[in-house]
Design a protein with these regions (language model features):
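ALDH superfamily catalytic-core signature
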Residues: 75, 197-202, 226-228, 237-391, ...
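Hydrophobic packing residues within well-ordered alpha-helices of enzyme cores
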Residues: 87, 108, 191-194, 222-223, ...
Length: 518
């Protein structure tokens, strides 16, 4: 029987008294770990964060917190080879894991470096300029940010067990707010391995971070207006959390990043044979095969001119023919497994729902050729490309198949594209692939209000582009509407989400003394 993963509670590792739930290897079906939070004292966790972790972090200046983050990232970087080995059990290939593991550690380094450059060596963060209020200049105002005295609870998704934790932890540490990490059960064993190294590093003060390995229990019952809930996952779970009394009655801050029917738009100028057409086809294939399509930023709707639909299908199909699906431990494999058999069933059901409006033009959602694996025990699925010839159908704008699946949707006139993009009702990211500046300008104007991020991809930037689906720590990640209405990352913007903005009023000398010593 595999080990029962421990939670880190009030300075001690806690192992539940029962057998817990078994977590399986996504590729082989073998048991990897067990998880349980039976009898976990969640009140003690929140109290410890507020009374021990928070004060300890707030005794550090912004610069000292930045140094602690660098020490932490350095320690994790030294151990990342072990994380990569463990990550294979999640179904991810080694290349997939780079985005999660190296990306998470790299994000921590970026936050440390940006903080060293941009934040003061103090405890108070000025926001904007001094505002003259009195006629004689003796009375002024100044907005400032200070650390929230509560706790940040992060509830994370299964697809990024390392990056998902670190990209939330880093800005919270800089803000001086302690964190409780609650990973998704399916991949909690990888988060747990990283968490043990975080604690062992000693880079953060005691109480700055705690860990719940299993269900959250009644943790939200102890949160209120001084606290932050940072969630990544499904829209349905976000709705449940958003409706909790911690948010609705006690006004805890709630930030959500949820499902997203992201689109990629091919411009009318990007016909077969142009660099932009080739870039578009390559991007589609990369998006639906990276992490087996299990990224919240994955392209779900491919909006293409009706005149090039057949060319796009041919181009995507030719590239997908080269994809090797199977056990990620085999170096010839280029696409691994979905996270679980349950997740594969969910994706197949979603594809069936999409097939009410679309037809499969590549792949078979129920059958796949595998290397070093079998589809009975491993959660494997072939890449699937669908075509929804009638762009008035609602299904592609409502159903997300969270796997290696995307749907082609044709458009006849450029004026239609903005309307089609908006039907996703809010997305994390969209991309525009075109070399026509007029088309790009029109698309940005119409699509930007519905997206948290827009990639404009063409031959001039392709060599350095980080791609449609990769959030960068310097840029905001999140989106309106269906995408959750939240925002994270974006450099030092992320730090302010864990702080309180207050307007100070007083004499210029007092305000200057307060802010100047920040």
């Amino acid at each position: 029987m595999p080990d029962l993963l421990a939670s880190y509670v009030a300075g001690n590792w806690y192992t539940a008294p029962d057998e817990g739930a078994v977590v399986l290897d996504a590729a082989t079906g073998d048991a990897v770990a067990r998880v349980s939070t039976t009898d976990l004292d969640t009140r003690a966790m929140v109290d410890h964060a507020r009374r021990v972790g928070g004060p300890a972090l707030r005794r550090l200046t912004f610069q000292e917190r930045a140094a602690a983050l660098r020490e932490l990232a350095t320690a994790l970087d030294a151990n990342k080879a072990a994380y990569h080995e463990l990550s294979l059990a999640t179904g991810a290939t080694r290349r997939d894991s780079t985005g999660d593991i190296d990306g998470g550690i790299g994000t921590t380094f970026v936050f440390s470096s940006r903080a060293k450059r941009e934040l003061p060596d103090g405890y108070l963060l000025a926001d904007g300029d001094v505002e003259p209020i009195g006629k004689g200049g003796a009375f002024v105002g100044q907005h400032v940010y200070t650390s929230l005295p509560g706790v940040a609870l992060q509830v994370n998704a299964f697809n990024f067990p390392v990056w998902g934790m670190l990209e939330k932890l880093a800005p919270a540490v800089l803000a001086g707010v302690p964190t409780i990490v609650k990973p998704a059960t399916q991949t909690a064993y990888l988060t747990a391995a990283v968490m043990r190294d975080i604690i062992a590093s000693g880079a953060l003060p005691e109480g700055a971070v705690q860990f719940v390995c299993g269900g959250a229990g009644d943790l939200l019952d102890h949160l209120g207006g001084e606290d932050v809930i940072a969630f990544t996952g499904s829209a349905s779970t976000a709705a449940v959390l958003r409706g909790n009394a911690a948010v609705t009655t006690r006004a805890a801050r709630f930030n959500a990043e949820t499902d997203s029917l992201n689109c990629s738009i091919l411009g009318p100028d990007a016909v077969a044979g142009t660099p932009e057409f080739d870039l578009y086809v390559k991007e589609i294939v990369r998006e639906i095969t990276t992490k087996a399509g299990q990224r919240c930023t994955c392209i779900r709707r491919a909006l293409v001119p009706a005149s090039v639909v057949d060319d796009v299908i041919a181009g995507v199909s030719a590239r997908l023919d080269k994809v090797v699906v199977g056990n990620p431990r085999n170096d010839t494999v280029t696409m691994g497994a979905l996270v679980s058999l349950h997740q594969r069933n969910e994706v197949r059901n979603a594809v069936a729902a999409l097939q009410r409006a679309a037809k499969v033009v590549y792949g078979d959602p129920t059958s796949v050729e595998l290397v070093d694996a079998d589809a009975e025990h491993g959660a494997f699925m072939a890449p699937v490309l669908l075509l929804c010839a009638d762009n008035e159908r609602s299904e592609p704008n409502e159903v997300e198949a969270f796997g290696p699946v995307t749907t082609l949707i044709p458009y006849s006139a450029p004026d239609d594209v903005g309307v089609l993009a908006a039907r996703g009702r809010g997305s994390l990211v969209g991309s525009i692939v075109s070399y026509d500046p007029d088309f790009v300008g029109a698309m940005v104007s119409s699509a930007a209000p519905h997206h948290g991020r827009l990639l404009i991809l063409d031959r001039d930037c392709a060599a350095e582009s980080t791609g449609h689906g990769t959030p960068m720590p310097q840029l905001v990640h999140g989106g309106p509407g269906r995408a959750g209405g939240g925002e994270e990352l974006g450099g030092m913007r992320a730090v302010r989400h864990f702080m309180q903005r207050t307007a100070l009023q007083g004499s210029p000398a007092v305000i200057a003394r307060l802010v100047g010593g920040s």
